Amino acid sequence: MVKILISTDPRYPVNRKVLRRAVMEVFEKEKITDIDAEISVAVVGRRKMKALTSKYLKDGRNHEVLSFPVEGTGGFARTPDDILRLGDVVLCWPEVLLCAARDNVTCDEEVLKLTGHGVEHLLGKHHGDTN
């Protein structure tokens, strides 16, 4: 079972079902089944995203999505309770809105795409990977 922890400010009307669907679609696409896993998804504003990028990426830009994996030096960390804690996906709501408008898609479609992208990073996929 995959436990999806969602954190969002009430100012950001993100559809939680879409966030959950995005996570589950990536797991299905990657044929990840019969696993106890946990992932968190947070929806934040520009100020919080800028603080995160300043601290962790040292660029201070507003990214649409960031991923913060929880892994040991040799890959995913084994926990005493056998729950695979993958990490956190963080979406910047104002950037989601801008991307949706730019790409002429709905906010839900953009949330689905960006959340899925973030989850793929947590699973070890990176830009340019073909597998």
Residue spans of the language-model regions?
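An acidic/histidine-cluster motif and surrounding catalytic segment
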Residues: 1-114, 119-131
